[in-house]
Amino acid sequence: MEIIHTPFGIDDPYFIVQGYEREPREPLEGDRVKVSFVTDPMVVGQRAWIEVQSDGKRYKRRAQYQLNHGGKAHWEVNIDGESAGVTVRYRFIAGRGPSTYVTSEWYEYTVCKWIEAKRFLSLKNNRLTVNRSDATSCDCLKEAYLLTDGKELYDLKIILEREEGERFYGLGEHFDAITIPEGEERYIHVYDQYKVQRSRGYAPVPFILSDRGRAILIDTGFLSSFKIDGSKITLSVYTKGCSIEGTEIQFWKEDSPLKAIEKIHKIARPCPPPLWALGPWLSANQWNSQKKVMEVLRETVQRDLPATTLVIEAWSDEQTFYIFNGAEYDPVSGDDKFSLKDFRFREPWPDPVEMINKLHERGIRLVLWQIPVIKSFDESTPQPAIDIRYGSSRGYFVRTRDGSDYRIPAARWHEGNVVVDFYNEEAAKWWASKREYLVEELGVDGFKTDGGEHLWGRDTLTAAGSAAKVRNTYPERYFETVSGILREEGILFSRAGYTRSPAHTLFWVGDEDSTWEALRDNITAGLNVSISGNPFWGWDIAGFSGEVPTMELYRRSIELAVFTPIFQLHSEDSGDPSPSSERTPWNLAKAWKDESIIDYYRNFASLRMTLSPYIYRESLHAAQASLPLTLPLFLIEKDNDPEGLAYLFGRDMVVSPAVDEEMKEESFFLKVNG
C-alpha cells in the first residue's frame, strides 16, 4: 500500500488538488490545518492516523475516511494551531492492523506570522527593495507587512492609498475587462488556462496604471497580485518559501496615463516586426503533411488570396520537435547535432526543401511550431531517447529537489515529459544547436514558440533557483534562446509571456472559441497587453476552437483583424477532421455553401496588404516612442468608455470594434490628423 500526500499540490493559485494537499499550504499563527491524503489501494477495514510532533508535543489522531475514488481511499485529519516560529512535523500511518501498517515519510512546516515591514524596505529613486541591511524610511506607504517564520523573510504585502474615483488598468493579458474590477485579488501567474480565461492569462504583467498617471511595476518572477478595493491598493508577492530579499517594486507618476505608459514600454523593449510579418497569415493544426501545405498554396494562388506567412504546427516527430515527421536518419550522440544532409526525408514530408522554396517563390515565409519539452514514446525513432539521456546526464533539464529530472505533472499540458532548463546556458546552447539547420540550411523564417507555462511547484528547480521564483520569467529565457538562431528578419510568435518577453517575440492572445463572446474577450486581452508594454499582438481570427464560425462572425472578425497588429487565421483540430475545421475562406465557403466569403476575405486581405507599409511605419514609431500600436482611446480622451474598446491604430486611424452580434454596422475607421 502507498500513502500519497502533496502538501503544496503544484502551487496552483487557482486550484487546490482535493484529497492530497494541506490547507492552508503555509499555515499562520493559530491556524488549524486540514491535511488530506490518499491510501492506494483502498482495502476493506483500513484505518489511518496522523502522528504529529511540535514544540515538544507529540500526539496521534485518527484520520476520517472521506471516499473511495478509483480504488483509492481519501482521508482528512486536522493539526492543531501553533505559535509563530514553531516547526510542525507529521506523518501518516495506515493499514488494517499492526501487521499491515504502512508509515509515510515525515512532512513539516514552520508556522509564520505577518510583521510590520517598513524597517526592512529601502526606497531609492522610486524603487522599493526588500533589503535588511540598507533599509530607509518608507513613510509613503500606508501599510507594509512581511511574512516571517522568525528567521527568514518571505511574502510581502503593501497597502497604498487610492485617490477617490481613481481607476486602474494593465496587468498584461486578461480577458474580462479593461478597467481592473474592484474587490478581486488579481494574480500575476503565467498560466495555461484553456479557453474562457477571464482573469487568468498566459502572458500577465505585474503592472498597473491609473487614470491619474500613477504606475506600479512589481519587478519579480514570484507570484504576485494586485487588489483595488475602496480607498486601498494592495500589492502582494508570494515567494512560496523562498527569501524575498532583493525583490523590487517600481513606482512612477506622470502628468498623464499616456506618459506613464512610456516607461513600461521602455522596460519591455518591444521589437517591431518585419514588413513580411504584417501581411495575412495562414495556419491550421490539421496541416500535417507536405501534400496539405501544397494544397493550401495552390488554393491561395488560384484564388488570388494575399498571404505572407504560413505556420505549420504538426510538422515534427512530436518528440524532439526538431526532426521532420517520417524522416529517416542515423542517430547521433546526444552532444551532436544534425545537418540537412543527415536526413532521408519520407512521407508525410518527402521534400521540405522543395516545399519551402515554393513558399518563398510566392513571397510566403514559413514559421514552424516549437515547445520547450522533449518526449520519447516511439522506439522506432531513437534520437529522442538519446537526447533525453544525454541532457539528463548533463543537468540540462529542470529538476526536482531530489536531483531527478522534473516531469510535467499529471493533467497538465504535455504531462510526464522533461522540460529544458534555459537558465542553464549550456543547456540553452545545446537545445538551440539542434535547430540551427532548420534556419541555416532549410531557410525557416521563424518559430511559433508555444508553451512556456510548464514549471509547477516550489520543489521544481532550475539553474536560477526554484520555480516559485522563475516560473513567470521562464518564457523570457525560452524566447531569448530561440531568437538567437534566427536570421535578421526572423520572428517568434508566442502565447506565453511576461514583462520583458516583447523584446524577443510577437504575441497572440488566446486560445478561444469561435463565438461572439470570445471575439470581445480577445480584443479586450489585446488592448490590455498593449497597455502593459506588449504592442505587437494578434489573435486567431474568429476563434480557433469548435465548429467553424458563423459567416457574420467570420466577416466581422476579418474586418477587425485588418486593423490589429497581426492578421492570423488558425484552427485547433489535428489530423484529418471531417468536416474540416480550418478557418481558411475556401473552407468556410464549403461549410456554409457560400462562395461570396472568398471574395469578401480577398478584399480585406488585400486591404491589409495595402496597409502593411503604414502598419510597419507605425510599428517602428510605436517601438521608438514607447507607445502601444493599438492605443486605447480612453487614455487620451477622458470621456471615452474603456469597455467600448475603441483605439488608435497607429497615429492616423481610429478603430471602433463591432464585437457584439447585435451591432449590425461594420466596424468603423476614421482618418484623423497625425
Where does each model-flagged region fall?
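Glycan-association/targeting regions that enable binding to alpha-glucans and other polysaccharides
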Residues: 1-156
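Catalytic and substrate-binding clefts that recognize carbohydrates or anionic sugar/phosphate headgroups
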Residues: 94-274, 283-286, 290-302
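Aromatic/acidic polysaccharide-binding cleft in carbohydrate-active enzymes
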Residues: 204-240, 533-601
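Aromatic-lined carbohydrate-binding/catalytic grooves of carbohydrate-active enzymes
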Residues: 273-464, 502
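Flexible, glycine/threonine-enriched loop-and-boundary segments that flank and lead into catalytic domains
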Residues: 290-296, 347-350, 354, 510-522, ...
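Carbohydrate-binding surfaces of carbohydrate-active enzymes
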Residues: 304, 484-485, 498, 567-674
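Substrate-binding cleft/loops of secretory-pathway carbohydrate-active enzymes
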Residues: 376-387, 455-464, 491-521, 531, ...
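Catalytic-core region of carbohydrate-active enzymes that cleave or remodel glycosidic bonds
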Residues: 436-440, 472-491, 509-574, 602-611, ...
